[in-house]
């Protein structure tokens, strides 16, 4: 991901770009979800940097081309939360932390450990203690889960992409920790919303995967966090990519900046 400087944070990696002149707005830390890497934020990172914001994007351990460390298949949610905390610690001041999908379970848990300026949760995985949350079928453990084939990636992530764009996306996906997936799918990891002292925006994609994001769940997540909620009717799960991403970015950040201004 061609975003400023590269810095290793243990088994993770941070891509970081500072503005020419520091401004009053907090930095933004971008955290990807399962199978993805910092590359999925390329467009958002460029837009944020062009607006004069300090922006950083995280490659979690074993993602974005990083080697899988020992015990990767047995690494659960809290192991990956350590990477997010390290990313926050690498910045000079509290950040707006943006999570996508499974990253939206990691981000609030990190925000329970470090001060943040705000949380933006896009197409979020639910906390384990969300009332009414639906479990998802578990995956076999013992070895990393292979990257999703292109057609499954299309239906789950990116029904809006062309065949060429989809092939590029599928080629970048990486093996995932089954422990991480199962702790999310089995709703094993609770979050304490009272321990997060920052405004929160939950973004719902109207064309998201209904198995993992059933109708009403994203709005329920917003209520759980006492946060704001925006639904983008035509947005898929990977709303950071492909046709429409410019409109979705504008809508999301107009709402997020308004929320931060009111905080």
Model-derived regions: residue spans:
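Active-site glycine-rich loops that stabilize anionic/oxyanionic intermediates
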Residues: 25, 33-37, 206-207
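Short beta-strand/loop motif that positions the catalytic acidic residue
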Residues: 196, 202-204
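Catalytic active-site module of serine/aspartate enzymes centered on a nucleophile-bearing elbow/loop
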Residues: 228-263
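Conserved alpha/beta-hydrolase
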Residues: 47-69
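Serine-hydrolase catalytic-loop signature spanning alpha/beta hydrolases and amidase-signature enzymes
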Residues: 35-43, 55
